[in-house]
Amino acid sequence: MKNIERVHLVYPVGNKISTPDTIGHHLQLALEKHYHVTTYNYDEIKIIQPGKSDVLIGHWHPNPLTVFRMSAKKKGWKRILALAPFCPDHSGWHNAFGKNIIEQCDRYLAITGNAWMNKLKESPFQHWLPKIVHLDLAVDRKDHPFIKEYFNPIGNRRFLYIGNTSWCKNTSFLEKLAQALPEIDFSWIGGNQSLKGLKTLGTLDFSKQEAKKLIQEYDYLITVGSADANPTTILEAMAWGLIPVCSVQSGYEGFSGIRNIPIENIDDAVKTINGLQSVSEAQLKKWQQENLDCLDNHFNWDRFCSQVLKEIESKFSPDLAEKTENNRLSLQAAELESPNYWGRPINFYRFLKTNLKYAFQNRL
């Protein structure tokens, strides 16, 4: 670690226990044990001039005027590492803009679930594969203490969705599912608008006792995303002791304690929910313990930060695989079609507003 002097970390770094702040917070603490670390807002207009022993690592942004994207074009970096969520779904909307900067990066530390890594070779991003390092998310169990001692009786199990209503969360399907099963309690934390068939609980601070007390009343966390990299709420639910129920398109598959639900057919989804209503308490407790073991052994910040440190110190910098004309055209179209496209008036307005706020703060 003597070859690197300073790490420029482009990531939100705050005191919140939710992502993205908690990612930046834990990374900063880990990196400062070995390097001088400077942090930046990932959506700010800024160009970093690299020192001869400096590393640029962090969150790229759809807008080309942002700090990571503009700084990555500068010569002289010891290493350039993208570190951001990755969802290689067929639409390509989440990450298509990365085509403009991936070649400048030595590696892409892709925060995503194993299900998406399994689909990468069939996606529009297949030529990125040599540069990608799979980086599973993490939670601190002290921030999300175990609270689910007992489950509701068979037939009275309750389902909780935690999240927003953006396109990738597929909440319209969740509404259909809840309406098809009016006898089952489906609730939502994360907003104040109404979702058909779900009880709206508003927004809550999960560090507060009243939020934990409310969550304790539920048995399953449900998320039916259609293009969701790997929602942190799944790991948070595991820590609390709830059993996650998620679509494969939410990033996780092959974990016995994370129950998958199909989203291609509503009847199959209804069948899955009805089956979960009759699972024994003993089986739920078994899944609960398997999930806690997963958190202790893998989905933790020591493992996460160790992977990042390894890539900072590595000299491996593979080229992209050969891309087809279909790949090129697909990603070009996806960037323009994406709801996150930087040139959309609403997105550009938010970008300017945010940077005016940063400019004002810097003058104080």
Q: Whereabouts are the PLM-identified features?
A:
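Conserved catalytic-core segment of nucleotide-activated headgroup transferases in glycan assembly
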Residues: 141, 152-200, 205-206
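Conserved acidic donor-binding segment of nucleotide-sugar-dependent glycosyltransferases
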Residues: 258-267, 275-281
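A short, active-site helix/loop in glycosyltransferases that binds the activated sugar's phosphate group
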Residues: 92-96, 103-130
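N-terminal pre-catalytic "stem/leader" segment of glycosyltransferase-like enzymes
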Residues: 1-62
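Aromatic "clamp/platform" in nucleotide-sugar-dependent glycosyltransferases that forms part
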Residues: 226
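Short hydrophobic beta-strand element within catalytic cores of glycosyltransferases
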Residues: 242-246
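A charged, aromatic-enriched C-terminal amphipathic alpha-helix characteristic of glycosyltransferases
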Residues: 281-343
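Acidic anion/phosphate-binding donor-loop and adjacent secondary structure
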Residues: 92-93, 133-156
